[in-house]
């Protein structure tokens, strides 16, 4: 059995602050479950161009608000209780809400190692 808290993760290299967001990597590749679970806080008034070339991601919003935009310009508001899935390694814009952070539980397959970090200075977007 594996039991962890957000507090436990904050003292490790599995707590990642990449500027526009923080991510607690609660379950990672070394745990051997075949997927990873992250608690992610997307900061209000931020925009990140992202793409997961090596992972599929499903996100469930547990608090706040924000939006995700695909590369065709379709914008999807995300609020508590909403889910979005990047099932085709979709490049996307992730935005925190205008007044609120967006809080997500993210599932990655295959799992993250836990120390991946976005690099937002690349105009083509951050990938891993």
Curated annotation (Swiss-Prot):
Pathway field: Amine and polyamine biosynthesis; ectoine biosynthesis; L-ectoine from L-aspartate 4-semialdehyde: step 3/3
This protein's record includes keyword Ribonucleoprotein: no
Keyword Transcription regulation tagged: no
Gene Ontology MF terms in the entry: ectoine synthase activity
SUPFAM superfamilies per UniProt: RmlC-like cupins
Keywords: Lyase
Broad class of enzyme this protein falls into: lyase
CDD domains in the record: cupin_EctC
UniProt-listed GO biological process terms: ectoine biosynthetic process
Signal sequence range: none
One Pfam family recorded for the sequence: Ectoine_synth
EC numbers: 4.2.1.108
Stated role: Catalyzes the circularization of gamma-N-acetyl-alpha,gamma-diaminobutyric acid (ADABA) to ectoine (1,4,5,6-tetrahydro-2-methyl-4-pyrimidine carboxylic acid), which is an excellent osmoprotectant.
Similarity comment: family membership: Belongs to the ectoine synthase family.
Protein name per Swiss-Prot or TrEMBL: L-ectoine synthase
Organism: Bradyrhizobium diazoefficiens (strain JCM 10833 / BCRC 13528 / IAM 13628 / NBRC 14792 / USDA 110)
